[in-house]
C-alpha cells in the first residue's frame, strides 16, 4: 500500500479498537469476579483496579494497557517505512518524513482507551496506554514522562497529579526534543495531552475540593466514591 492517508486511516482504526480493549474490566471479572466500574472511581484503569481488585489485577492491567499501546506503534512503524519515506522513519519517525502518521496512530490508540466502543464510548483515562505508545514512538520521552509521573506521585501521593503532570509534559517534551517535526505530529501530541487532562476532570475537581483519594496498595473500596 503506497497511499499514506489510506494507510494511516487503516492503522488508526485498528489502533483505536486495540486501544479500546478494557483489560482492567476483563481482569477484574476473571480474577475477582468484580466489575471495577461499580466501585471507587468507576474507572477501568490501573488505579481503580488497584483500589477495587488489588495489586495483582492492577499490575496486569498496567502491563496489558501499556502493551496494547506499544503494539499499535510497533505494527504501524514498519508499514510506514515501507511507503518509501526512507531510513529515518523505520528507526525513529519523530522529526522524519511521515512523522505525523505515527502521531495519528498514537492518538487513535489513546482515544480508543478513553472512548472505548466496547463500553458505550466510556473507558479509562489514557495514562498506561499513553505510556505504551510514547515508549514505542520515542522511548527517551516516554521514560522522561514516566520519571515525571513517579516523582509527582511520590511527592503528593496522588496518582492523578502524576498523570496530569505527564499529560501536560508530553506536548512540551515533543516540541522541545523535535522542534522541526511536522505540525501534524505536534498537534497529535497536544491532543493526547489535552484529552488525558480532560479525562481527569473529575479528579481535578476532587483535588480542588480535597476529596481526591491518595495512593494506597492495601486499602480496598467496595462502594462508589462520593462525587
Q: What are these regions, as identified by a protein language model?
A:
Residues 50-54, 76-79, 108, 125-156, ...:
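Interfacial segments of multi-pass membrane proteins
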Residues 12, 16, 61-65, 69, ...:
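Alpha-helical transmembrane segments of multi-pass membrane proteins, especially transporters
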Residues 130, 177-178, 185-186, 190-198, ...:
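Long C-terminal subdomains/extensions of small-metabolite kinases
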Residues 2, 18, 23-73, 114-127, ...:
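Interhelical loop and helix-boundary elements at the membrane-water interface
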Residues 122, 146-150, 182-189, 206-213:
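A cytosolic-side transmembrane-helix exit/cap motif
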Residues 1-10, 74-104, 135-141, 176-188:
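Helix-coil boundary and interhelical linker segments in multi-pass alpha-helical membrane proteins
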Residues 15-18, 77, 108-113, 149-153, ...:
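Alpha-helical transmembrane segments of multi-pass membrane proteins
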Residues 143, 159-166, 181-192:
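Loop-to-transmembrane alpha-helix initiation sites
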